[in-house]
């Protein structure tokens, strides 16, 4: 994520700010310009209609029907207005989703909503299992997220129970968007699908059997040599989604570190490494950064920021993901359901 500043006074700001902490200027985030802009009284833009409901600070054209930004418009189900606890969880989830959408935009990956593709477009159902039966997952372009994952205590309990080193709302979004891009980009390409089978296995293998086998017997011995997480061992589709999520972790963390002066300036999204050595360059920058950040976390008494090892087999899978992202990006202008400011 980029480093942001107030255009009026230069105050350093965060992605989430809707007002300058120094001069008080009203601000909004422009996805098209990847910047915070001052909202003048006579501006032809305004803040998203979900400013209060989802704490959304994104800009939309003033004449846009519905007034929802290109992130919020992708959500097709949310808690009811009477569910105050659910709405608080919803706001936290939308904040994580905005970070996801901004990164996908930076990577120039296609973001096609249901209004453009009613049958297969991207959509989100953000609902809480505290009030109904909700299972996090992806199906035919629709990502469902259990908002209970936004509760720190609940999420930490699940993390410990499932023996996971890392579990966050943003991580869930990145995992599920991996499923979406398999559905959107890989399944429809014979060339990509062939390479997928070589690296990840059969995506059509019985999922229920794989799920039962995983939770009954756990990951296979020596899984750390070939998989980024124990959950990735369950099924080829989960291996892809887990590896895709880690690719997004790495790219966004490198971009943020570069903007903050903690990594080479060439690690930002707007200065992508090119050519056959591009992926190697990314990893060569990531390994010393992640090690250093882990040591900083330990110095503060926290667990490692990135508690994962990337063996050669995982890097080959991730290299394929990088190739797909690199090849599909020129074919898609950033596509959103509404005009992008």
From Swiss-Prot:
InterPro entries the record matches: UCP012641, Zinc-ribbon_6_bact
Protein's name in the database: Uncharacterized protein Mb2598c
Biological source species: Mycobacterium bovis (strain ATCC BAA-935 / AF2122/97)
């Amino acid at each position: 994520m980029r480093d942001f500043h107030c255009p009026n006074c230069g105050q350093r700001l965060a992605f989430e700010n809707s007002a300058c902490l120094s001069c008080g200027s009203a601000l909004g985030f422009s996805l098209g310009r990847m910047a915070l802009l001052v909202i003048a009284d006579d501006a032809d833009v305004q803040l998203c209609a979900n400013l209060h409901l989802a704490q959304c600070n994104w800009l939309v054209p003033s004449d846009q029907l519905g007034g929802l930004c290109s992130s919020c418009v992708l959500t097709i189900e949310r808690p009811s207005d009477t569910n105050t606890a659910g709405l608080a969880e919803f706001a936290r989830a939308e904040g994580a989703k905005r970070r996801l959408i901004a990164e996908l935009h930076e990577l120039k990956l296609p973001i096609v909503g249901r209004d453009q593709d009613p049958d297969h477009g991207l959509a989100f159902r953000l609902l809480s299992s505290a009030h109904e039966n909700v299972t996090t997952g992806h199906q035919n372009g629709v990502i469902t997220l259990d908002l209970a994952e936004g509760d720190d205590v609940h999420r930490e309990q699940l993390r410990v129970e499932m023996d996971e080193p890392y579990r966050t709302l943003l991580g869930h979004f990145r995992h599920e968007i991996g499923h979406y891009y398999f559905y959107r980009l890989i399944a429809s390409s014979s060339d990509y699908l062939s390479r997928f089978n070589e690296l990840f296995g059969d995506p059509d293998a019985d999922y229920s059997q794989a799920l039962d086998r995983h939770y009954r017997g756990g990951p296979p011995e020596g899984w750390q040599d070939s998989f980024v997480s124990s959950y990735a061992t369950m099924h080829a589709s989960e291996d892809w989604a887990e590896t895709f999520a880690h690719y997004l972790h790495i790219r966004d963390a490198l971009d943020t570190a570069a903007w903050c002066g903690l990594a080479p300036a060439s690690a930002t999204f707007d200065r992508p490494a090119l050519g056959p050595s591009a992926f190697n360059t990314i990893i060569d920058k990531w390994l010393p950064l992640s090690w250093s950040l882990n040591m900083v976390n330990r110095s503060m008494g926290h667990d490692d920021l990135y508690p994962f090892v990337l063996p050669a087999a995982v890097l080959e899978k991730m290299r394929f993901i990088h190739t797909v992202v690199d090849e599909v990006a020129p074919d898609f202008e950033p596509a959103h359901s509404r005009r992008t400011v």
